[in-house]
C-alpha cells in the first residue's frame, strides 16, 4: 500500500536500501542478512514492476543486484554508482554487472563522490577520474547505458566539479573525447528518461 501511495504522489523510482541491510534486501555496507533480496523484497520488486516504479540498485549488495536482475521484468537503474574496475569499492558495479544491467536495457549513473571514483586518493579525486568511469562504461556497453548521478547532497563533488555550476566541464570533456551531441544528451538524462518511459509499457 505504501508503494501505491508513493506512486500516487509522483515517486518515479525507489532505492531498495541505504547503508545497511533492511527488510527488503542486503546492502553493500551490510552484513548479508538475506543473501540478496528477502522474501518481502521479492514481493516489492514484483509490485514495483507491476505499477511501473523504477528499481534503483545503488547501495545494494552484489547478491541483491543479482536477484533484482533475475527477477525484474523491466529495466533497472543504478542512480549513483561507479565502476569497480577503476575503483575497487563495494558500492561500485563490476564489469559483469554493468553488462547485465545494460543487457536488460538499464542505465548506471556515475557518482561524483571521491570514494567511488578514486580508491587510492578519494580526497584528490578529479573530474578527469570521473570521465574515465564514463568512458569505461561506454567501452563496455556503449553510450546508451550510462549517465551522471552527482550525489552533491550526499558528499559528492570532485576537483574540477564541486557543484552544479561546474558540471558544464563534464560536457566539455566528453566533447573533447569525441562523443557526439546526441550521446552527450543521452548521458545527461536521455538514457535515464528512456528507462523511466519503459516503466509505462505493458509487461510482457
Residues of each region from the PLM?
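Short, solvent-exposed loop/turn segments at secondary-structure boundaries
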Residues: 88-90, 121-123, 158-162
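Short acidic/histidine-rich active-site segments
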Residues: 111-112, 141-164
Amino acid at each position: 500500500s505504501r508503494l501505491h501511495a508513493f506512486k500516487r504522489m509522483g515517486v518515479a523510482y525507489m532505492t531498495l536500501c541505504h547503508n545497511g541491510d533492511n527488510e527488503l534486501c542486503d546492502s553493500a555496507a551490510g552484513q548479508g542478512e538475506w543473501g540478496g533480496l528477502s522474501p518481502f523484497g521479492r514481493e516489492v520488486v514484483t509490485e514495483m514492476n507491476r505499477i511501473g516504479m523504477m528499481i534503483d540498485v545503488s547501495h545494494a549488495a552484489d547478491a541483491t543486484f543479482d536477484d533484482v536482475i533475475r527477477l525484474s521484468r523491466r529495466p533497472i537503474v543504478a542512480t549513483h554508482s561507479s565502476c569497480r574496475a577503476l575503483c575497487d569499492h563495494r558500492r561500485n558495479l563490476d564489469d559483469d554487472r554493468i553488462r547485465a544491467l545494460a543487457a536488460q536495457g538499464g542505465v548506471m549513473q556515475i557518482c561524483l563522490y571521491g570514494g567511488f571514483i578514486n580508491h587510492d586518493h578519494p580526497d584528490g579525486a578529479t573530474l578527469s577520474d570521473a570521465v574515465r568511469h564514463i568512458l569505461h562504461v561506454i567501452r563496455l556497453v556503449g553510450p546508451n547505458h550510462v549517465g551522471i548521478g552527482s550525489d552533491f547532497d550526499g558528499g559528492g563533488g570532485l576537483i574540477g566539479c564541486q557543484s552544479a555550476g561546474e558540471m558544464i566541464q563534464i560536457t566539455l570533456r566528453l566533447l573533447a573525447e569525441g562523443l557526439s551531441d546526441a550521446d552527450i544528451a543521452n548521458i545527461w538524462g536521455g538514457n535515464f528518461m528512456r528507462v523511466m518511459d519503459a516503466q509505462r509499457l505493458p509487461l510482457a
